[in-house]
């Protein structure tokens, strides 16, 4: 219910900076290429992210930053903690079934609640600014931490599919999840991010 949404959320155009309790989410820039490549160049991340290659070079990071600069919806964010990049979160509006939430964190930042905090902020943008009615997401069956993030954000399990993972070079089972605008709205008391 939009009348219950704090005023900072009710603005036109894509968010450029989101602030949560501990994180800053902002558009990535070419100045971030080295940090992105350093964080993403870990096989454990690539094995749980469909399109992330391994090894992950600065050329990959440069191409990704260039592509995210063309994201007119402003739904791709670099996640920062204490002014240092720790990962990425965003919504793919070109996904087949519904806009799809995706994220990854550098391994040193796993298990601290950052994924859930960043995902909630990106979800808010998708529903409030993007006008999404539903969001989709997926997590490898072998990745319970990612499934936990999705469940904490209100996503509901919708089935299992096979998806190809670039770093694995094969298809692997993925739990699929959905989040409707109605469920998101009812869970909105999870706190809010502040936009600048």
Model-derived features: positions:
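Conserved GNAT-fold acetyl-CoA-binding loop/helix
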Residues: 44-66
């Amino acid at each position: 219910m939009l009348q219950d949404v704090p005023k900072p959320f009710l603005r036109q155009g894509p968010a450029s900076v989101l602030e949560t309790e501990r994180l800053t989410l902002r558009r990535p820039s070419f100045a971030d290429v080295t940090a992105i490549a350093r964080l993403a160049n870990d096989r454990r991340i690539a094995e749980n992210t469909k399109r992330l290659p391994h090894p992950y070079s600065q050329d990959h990071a440069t191409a990704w930053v260039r592509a995210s600069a063309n994201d007119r919806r402003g739904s791709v964010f670099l996640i920062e903690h204490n002014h240092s990049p720790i990962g990425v979160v965003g919504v793919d509006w070109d996904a087949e079934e519904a806009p799809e939430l995706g994220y990854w964190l550098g391994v040193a930042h796993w298990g601290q609640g950052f994924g859930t905090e960043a995902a909630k902020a990106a979800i808010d943008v998708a529903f409030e600014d993007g006008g999404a009615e539903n969001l989709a997401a997926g997590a490898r069956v072998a990745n319970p931490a990612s499934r936990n993030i999705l469940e904490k954000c209100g996503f509901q399990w919708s089935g299992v599919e096979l998806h190809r993972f670039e770093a694995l070079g094969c298809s692997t089972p993925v739990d699929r999840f959905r989040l409707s605008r109605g469920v998101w709205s009812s869970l909105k008391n999870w706190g809010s991010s502040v936009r600048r």
